[in-house]
Curated annotation (Swiss-Prot):
Location relative to the cell: Cytoplasm
Organism: Methanothermococcus thermolithotrophicus (Methanococcus thermolithotrophicus)
SUPFAM superfamilies associated with the record: Ribulose-phoshate binding barrel
Gene Ontology cellular-component annotations: cytoplasm
InterPro entries per the UniProt record, alphabetical: Aldolase_TIM, His_biosynth, HisA_bact_arch, Isoase_HisA-like, Isoase_HisA-like_bact, RibuloseP-bd_barrel
Annotated catalytic residues: D8 (proton acceptor), D130 (proton donor)
Reaction catalyzed: 1-(5-phospho-beta-D-ribosyl)-5-[(5-phospho-beta-D-ribosylamino)methylideneamino]imidazole-4-carboxamide = 5-[(5-phospho-1-deoxy-D-ribulos-1-ylimino)methylamino]-1-(5-phospho-beta-D-ribosyl)imidazole-4-carboxamide
Protein name as it appears in the record: 1-(5-phosphoribosyl)-5-[(5-phosphoribosylamino)methylideneamino] imidazole-4-carboxamide isomerase
Family indicated by similarity: Belongs to the HisA/HisF family.
Keywords tagged on the record: Amino-acid biosynthesis, Cytoplasm, Histidine biosynthesis, Isomerase
GO process annotations (BP): L-histidine biosynthetic process; L-tryptophan biosynthetic process
CDD domains to which the protein is assigned, alphabetical: HisA (cd04732)
Family matches, as HAMAP family: HisA
């Protein structure tokens, strides 16, 4: 199982938010490129980049910063935030993204997943499923859908998603620990790989996730707040 550090960008800085609220930050660091280099120097084999400005604006805003990180580090990156128009997917793949992460746009219109998968390759298309109280939520976690993660996951899998990024919104950014059960259910029900995110606080959380068969785990606040040592986490998950 791969441990994937998150580098979330807002206004050109690296931040970690509480419950996705731009007004509530655990962390704010000046240079996202230096942060990315730090995690790679500690053994990260992949990075998770999120353009938070893009998520709000609906299109990729920090594209040049993302490009600089990709050119600077020597590991694959997956990119999310504001990927809602077709030209953006191609642009991000062209600048070197291993995977692009589709969110609300894919849940609202799963046919887009099929279209983009045919265009750039299934393996490059990840869809983010954010769940709150057992239902998929969209539009910055503000709107609840009628679908469970498994129901939507199966639709997206059929449409050509190459992988799923599952976030438990109930625990995201709170540093309260991981709820493994919904992740395990998703892994059991889907054929495509699942990456978990949200609430990881200890290496024990990571070991539990490895046991249920996730391909990887995105870690954010816990490594920025020094609750988890990245080197030790990577070692424990090999």
């Amino acid at each position: 199982m791969i441990v994937i550090p998150a580098v979330d960008m807002k206004n050109g800085k690296c931040v970690q938010l509480i419950q996705g609220d731009p007004n509530k930050k655990h962390v704010e660091l000046e240079n996202p490129v230096e942060v990315a280099e730090k995690w790679v120097s500690e053994g990260a084999e992949m990075l998770h980049l999120v353009d938070l400005d893009g998520a709000i604006e609906g299109e990729s805003v920090n594209r040049e910063l993302i490009k600089e990180i990709i050119q600077t580090v020597n590991v694959p990156v997956q990119i999310g935030g504001g990927i809602s128009v077709r030209c953006t997917e191609s642009n991000l793949i062209e600048i070197g993204a291993k995977r692009i992460i589709l969110g609300t746009v894919a849940v609202e219109n799963p046919d887009i997943v099929e279209e983009i998968s045919k265009k750039v390759g299934k393996e490059k298309v990840m869809v983010a499923l954010d769940a709150k109280d057992g239902k998929v939520v969209i539009k910055g976690w503000k709107e609840k859908t009628k679908y469970t993660p498994v129901e939507m996951g199966k639709i997206l899998e059929e449409k050509g998603a190459g992988s799923i990024l599952f976030t438990n919104v109930n625990v995201e950014g709170l540093l309260t620990g991981m709820n493994v059960e919904p992740v395990e259910t998703l892994v059991e029900e889907l054929e495509i790989p699942v990456i978990a995110s949200g609430g990881v606080t200890t290496i024990e959380d990571l070991i539990k996730l490895k046991a249920v068969g996730v391909e990887g785990v995105v870690v954010g606040s816990a490594i920025y707040k020094n609750l988890i040592d990245l080197k030790e986490a990577i070692k424990a998950c090999r």
